[in-house]
């Protein structure tokens, strides 16, 4: 199995290291030519969604990636990656792929000082530590979206 990690901005190295510890081959996507490689999944990392979207368009990567996602490429998205996938962003203009039927709110947990740690259950996995650093909040999900974890208010 080979997983591509979007590596134009954000926390891509952390995702690569985690996948490599699991024995998964990774490839970095930095330019349009990198999309010509074969890969079985995609990671859209945390970072700054506005910057990532702009860079993907400037590097001519946006449309080819969107097409792969629409064709069914499995995607793991964290933070900014989730914002890129969301069909709706309630407190900002939509700049992403709009392929996941969710509505998110950017920076919903406030400023950097409002960051927090939470241990919660993930369906099929168990208790897992989670960090929320200016993270997006999922306000609503489409009928076909399965919720795997929720943070208690």
Feature map (PLM): residue ranges:
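Fold-independent oxyanion-binding glycine-rich loops
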Residues: 8-9, 29, 46-47, 78-80, ...
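Cysteine-nucleophile active-site neighborhood
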Residues: 49-120
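Amide-donor transfer/coupling interface in amidating biosynthetic enzymes
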Residues: 106-153
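Short low-complexity stretches enriched in small and charged residues
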Residues: 1-9, 32-36, 54-55, 84-91, ...
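N-terminal beta1-alpha1 cap of cysteine-dependent amidohydrolase-like domains
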Residues: 1-58, 63-68
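Solvent-exposed alpha-helices and their adjacent loops that cap or buttress functional pockets
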Residues: 34-36, 67-68, 76, 122-125, ...
């Amino acid at each position: 199995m080979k997983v591509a990690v979007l590596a134009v901005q954000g926390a891509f190295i952390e995702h690569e290291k985690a996948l490599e510890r699991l024995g998964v081959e990774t490839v970095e996507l930095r330019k349009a030519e990198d999309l010509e490689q074969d890969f079985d999944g995609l990671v859209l990392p945390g970072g700054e969604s506005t910057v990532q979207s702009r860079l993907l368009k400037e590097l001519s990567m946006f449309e080819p990636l969107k097409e792969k996602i629409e064709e069914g490429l499995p995607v793991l998205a964290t933070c900014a990656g989730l914002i890129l996938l969301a069909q709706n962003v309630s407190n900002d203009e939509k700049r992403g792929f709009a392929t996941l039927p969710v509505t998110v709110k950017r920076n919903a947990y406030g400023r950097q000082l409002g960051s927090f740690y939470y241990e919660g259950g993930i369906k099929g996995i168990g208790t897992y530590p989670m960090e929320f650093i200016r993270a997006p909040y999922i306000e609503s999900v489409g009928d076909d979206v399965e919720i795997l974890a929720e943070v208690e208010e």
